Curated annotation (Swiss-Prot):
Pfam families to which the protein is assigned, alphabetical: FtsJ
Active site: K191 (proton acceptor)
UniProt entry keywords in alphabetical sequence: Cytoplasm, Methyltransferase, rRNA processing, S-adenosyl-L-methionine, Transferase
Sample GO molecular function, one term: rRNA (uridine-2'-O-)-methyltransferase activity
Protein residues bound to S-adenosyl-L-methionine: G88, W90, D111, D127, D151
The protein's Enzyme Commission number: 2.1.1.166
Name of this protein: Ribosomal RNA large subunit methyltransferase E
Gene (UniProt): rlmE
Amino acid sequence: MKKTTKPPTGGYGGSGSHELYQRVKKKAGTIKASSRRWLERHLNDPYVHQSKVDGYRSRAAYKLIEINERYKFLKKGQKVIDLGAAPGGWCQVAERIVGSSNEKPSVVGIDYLHVDPLPRVAMLEMDFLHADAPQKLIETLGTKPDVVLSDMAAPTTGHRQTDHLRTIYLCEVAADFALSVLKPGGHFLAKAFQGGAENTLLAILKQHFKKVYHVKPPASRSESVELYLLALEFKGKTKIQE
């Protein structure tokens, strides 16, 4: 796959984006200052521009690309499950790397939000926290995964510690799923928010994987508290787990 982790340093290009920017400026008095700042940052984000060029559905695709370029845990022929997949950027990246087909998809995503169909990717529209979700994922994939990805994050409240705890909970649920379904030697990548509560999860991951890392890829905004937990080379189920 073409290297795309160093997008142009300029703002979002094209006449369409310029027109949108002008509309944003004209309506500046009718929207909150925080919303206006977000729109202006979004329009000038080089990753947003590059995602249009490369055909990815979100700038988040580059977070996965950058992490994988460094640690090379996604490889051709693997089976992948993506939790919290909307709008589909991570599934696109995974499919392009591991290879897949419409008849027998190697990448399965799940989200309670609707995701428009993606070529060679199976998508389940359901809440991962539903009791039936884990079984549905394995049935759809047809085998145990080599990689479990999770970009799940709880809706933010504006209270940093609350947001941290809610997202860490989702990370813990994703990790529990990964520990129960991964093939030996498999890998797990999940979003977390910095705040301290991730230390317990890190300790658990270190028991079950040979290598565990904190990762903050360049595509993750510097002011964001998000980071990613990457656990490599699953040791396999212990007798207690079994």
